[in-house]
Amino acid sequence: TWMWALTGIGLFIGSLLSPKIIFPISLITIVLLIVVFFVRNLDFINIIVYILPILVGITLFWTTQFYIEQLGNALVFGVFIGTILVFVLLGLIGMVIPDISEIGNYLLVTLLVLIIFSILFMFFPIGNTVLLVLAGIAVLLFSLYTVYDFNQIRHGYVRERDVSLMALNLYLDFINLFVNILQFISR
């Protein structure tokens, strides 16, 4: 719950800032995520885990504003409620199915490929069809990540020192599901 409180603070801060801040904040967020997930042995990782929801909240404010302008308040709110329901359902699935830890590497490779293509497409114009496909792949990927992360918890693969990182994983699963469902619908 503390991540959501920090996200709320980030949303408030985002409402006070110019939308021009999104790109630098997004870059900082990506760098911090890379540090958290690939350099886990640093003493200050927990500090970064607390900073990330604030940064995500700032960018989420402007992302949500963009989709509210495109789709309207009611649809964005409906997608948010729908994302909550889907997330809970995926979590339940992850808790009841047998161990699926072997898919973790495939999910990571898919995520890295998706990130690379997303970065490339920032510099090269692409059509709505490609963006629709990318958003669809991202929705599927983060759905699978949600099932996978809950499954990791269920089968005892989360060590005590990694609890805050797993909380961050689940938080990011939800945020990415929400944003990518919005992106998919807007295409």
At which residue positions do the language-model features occur?
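A hydrophobic alpha-helical transmembrane-helix feature that marks the membrane cores
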Residues: T1-R187
